[in-house]
Amino acid sequence: MENAYILGGLRSYVGVVNGMYRHIPAEVLGAEVLKQVMEKYQLREPDYIIAGNGVGAGGNIARLMALTAGVDISVPAFTVDVQCGSGLESIAVAAAKINSGEADVIIAG
């Protein structure tokens, strides 16, 4: 079994409903965070991108984020939706994939 480690993290600014982000699609906000994570930690293309989605916006927000951020189309990306626990659950799924040897580098949150 491989060990999984959390390298670090970033997030978007927190806004209010109908505030400064109201005209910016979620995938654009997420893509910016994704690009910054890859740059800050000098990550190569990850094996997976796993995004937590607590508001059920529909579709696969992780895939949209990855494509918007310019991540190679071959990198799988999927969304976990368990409401308030989605971010933590996406990290748990990432750890399980790394522990099993299925992946080496995953961006999750």
Where are these regions (language model features)?
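Residues that mark the start of a beta-strand
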Residues: 3, 104-105
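Conserved catalytic cysteine-centered active-site region
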Residues: 52-104
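Short beta-strand segments
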Residues: 8-9, 81, 106-109
